């Protein structure tokens, strides 16, 4: 699939790729551009919606601008943006398959009557089509076509109605609301009856928004629309009434459900869809089974009447072939989760259209080219900086409720807005009226496979399909345009008790000159609104302590102040306290209760939580709705069956009932998700908003201080450095905030699970007992009435087919925990990865490849003479000539005052340095960090912009050996840790070190010696001993040998030795002709003790065995002996002197890494073939010995 990018707004009309066409059912004309077969772009506002909307019809969160996309420059930007997004989608295999299917999934043609498919009304075809090659071939066919052929519905027509252009989708600009994306079907009936119809996409590529910390990728938004268009092209659009409960709205006890369209739920991905996939019977409706039947109906017509019909052109047949080899189940299983992985893109964790209830969107202007290309955001979704759109001033604010907080005298203190989620609402309790069908016919199991649903698409085949040139138009291919306008009202409610939304509003800055206060009542009662509510106690205490100090008028004073502000914020926002509840230990940030007035307890949140439990955090505590269920009685027609037949029938009924009970369990699980967990999720979102509000307050305090400082007599260069350092600290503040958000996630997810375990699941069991007891009674009575079985057989059947407690243990709490844990762990891929640089080097066929695989797009430049040689566990950089350099450039490397970092690498130095010689560093103007050689040792030096310096000398690393160096800088603890291999060799305070802002370049340099560097990495966090040890041994995983338990094989430790062929039979010592040998225990009935094996290191510095190590093997059964090789028979013989032992090479097998090989002079130790009662351990190259006999296993 090629995307035609040779287009611009001024491309001349050629009636092929650039056309002027009529909008359906109108006299409106627009210019359309074919970017791929059957895929068109119209850089215009959508013609089907008015651009001028009365205020009462404007929707909350929308932006209405009738002038948008009215200029050629805007239309050109729109066209190029859509082309870029389509190329980005097409840049991946799955995206290419999606576009290929959209291109080929043509609606089923009207008028085909050859095998039983007839037009709903063949007399609506319009005039007889023009003569063309395709129709001429059809007329001569023996199959009767009405008016000589079939008609196609997927086309756009020229303004003179003479030319028709094949089209499956047309991508327009937005309609009335310029920030609302939508997909509209051409003909509703065909979109639902299996015929299929073309689609129009309304899309806004020039604006995006943020969710949490990342920008929404417009390619993912367009993909969502493309997937939805497939529902229309396949004719499987569900009814607009097919909705499911999404969340329970509980503001001020007004019970109402939000409803989510099933298509949006299936497509959106995120935790909603993942939760469905943990719940295979989550939804039952005839839509699924009916859609499958319709698909099979048209597929059968295609296979029997079209596929082998030579009268029909390949442009139609081959497209239908591609369409029908992908089932409707494949379409249902398409969701954004697949594409987010393919595009390496982050998506919202909940249904994105409903997120405006939790997050008020601000829009940013997309910059295609500089900040975004076919690989996505150039600097990633988190680190990209896009300008706020000037259209944000036009965002419509229509809250669902206004909460008026009043005091005891009913005087209004503040008004806070509660916004809707943009979904339809209903007061009907879905769960109390929903009947769980006993019949499995309408049940649909969602696919939980990791395989991409469109793998059947052959891109090569699609590319070879001829384009549809001649169109036989079916004129009635579209509905009349309908534009429904909806009004909304705002309800005002009065409360005397402050709600979380009031607490949130009190944390928002409304005055440039503000003061922090922990007294909420004082904040909301202040007349000038100069107080801002805060729970950052340590920070407020610090600011209060220094308020009478002298002015901050030097860079050093500012750095000291900024460092303390950062430390106190980090401490306040991330300090946690353990809560011991009935569900175990949970950990909560201590500010949680105060931030949102949760439990209305001020400082006693933990105590109240322990007393009341996690259910107290939400408003819904009444009983669950019990579902309507129906279970068929056992039919009397079975009474006379034989024991065998009756047993089979009862087993079928018993199994069906168990499945039905599982559906009931999932109904309870879904109620918890919709009615309970949705409230915990709302708390998560509000807590995150509170964190962001506090972060904004702190940033404003810092900004104000910087503004004051800029008025002092500070040199411009110094002031510039302060500004850049401050911006770096702002990033560090955001990182601390994200850590706190993750802790809130974890706490509330655990709380919600606890509610399910303690409140919901027991009610399910209680509910089931009523029905199970009744079923068991009826089952016993039925079996007792059976006439063709004896009493013993009746007893067997009763015992087999009456339900017991064990049959209802559906709860898999670990699966639910894993589900939530995975969500917390995958918050943001870019943020979770601590690596700012992870060096990868390999030798290519024509040149060396040296690149960064951290995902942070580090630019690497190096001297051409730099070589790659095998090092510890892979290719290492070998710098042997003077002044060879490797430079790594990335803005992440610009350290400042508050950011943590770690540098790790393997180093081998083969020279000698008495003078100071630089190795690697990030330093400019004598500020930053540096590692250099001096006095035959290694020195790490860190120096700030004020001249404060700390140096650590490391000896014993210049001796031709490999060493793993880890240097960790923790600015919160003011701690410098240095590790060599797995040992901590330095722990130094760096409290006096302030700003080390230097450059975005890390340079690796060789001056006069030969150095080897491998696995160079830079992390954005400090590391502790445990992590260094884990990394050290993990990297050596391929070079270190392991025992049978996969533990590192140790020198001087006792093991038992087994052969791969006989893994349960150990070796023992055998005396033969006054000599000692080793053999398997083949003598039955004799208790012969196994001998112990011990590998003795030749290199005494080694504690663990590595590949290709030479060692001496000691054997002990009370007396130590050593392995030698008999020159007479090549057997392994035991000698008493270590001096006479052979130095044996130890290795692992390439294909069985858990097995060990021993060799001497390139000959391997193996088991001999059976020799009487013995299989000797021998050393030879006898190829008759089975391969496995050369492999050994050491067990501790």
From Swiss-Prot:
Task: For this entry, list what GO says about its biological process.
Answer: proteolysis
Residue span of region C-heavy chain nHC:
829-1195
Q: Where is this region: Light chain nLC?
A: 1-408
Question: What does the sequence similarity comment in the record state about its family?
Answer: Belongs to the botulism non-toxic nonhemagglutinin family.
Disulfide bond positions:
583-754
Extent of the signal sequence: none
> Which Gene3D superfamilies did the record assign?
2.60.120.200, 2.80.10.50, Clostridium botulinum neurotoxin b, 'coiled-coil' domain, Metalloproteases ('zincins'), catalytic domain like
Q: Where in the cell is it found?
A: Secreted
Taxonomic lineage of this organism? Viruses, Duplodnaviria, Heunggongvirae, Uroviricota, Caudoviricetes
Q: Which UniProt keywords apply?
A: Disulfide bond, Secreted, Virulence
Q: What is this protein called?
A: Non-toxic nonhemagglutinin type D
* One GO location term (cellular component): extracellular region
Give the source's domain of life in one word: Viruses
Its function, per the record, reads: Assembles with botulinum neurotoxin type D (BoNT/D) and protects it against pH-mediated inactivation or protease activity at pH 2.6 (the pH of the animal gastrointestinal tract) but not at pH 6.0. The non-toxic component is necessary to maintain toxicity.
Further comment found in the protein's record: This protein can also be encoded on a prophage.
Cite the record's note on assembly.
Answer: Forms a highly interlocked heterodimer with botulinum neurotoxin type C at pH 6.0 but not at pH 7.5. Botulinum toxins are produced as progenitor toxins of large molecular sizes of 12S (M toxin) and 16S (L toxin). M toxin consists of a non-toxic, non-hemagglutinin component (NTNHA) and the neurotoxin. L toxin consists of the M toxin and the 3 subcomponents of hemagglutinin (HA). HA is composed of subcomponents of 70, 33, and 17 kDa. Erythrocyte agglutination occurs when the entire complex is assembled.
Among its keywords, does the record have Secreted? yes
Q: Which GO terms describe its molecular function?
A: metalloendopeptidase activity; zinc ion binding
Annotated region N-heavy chain nHN: the residues are 409-828
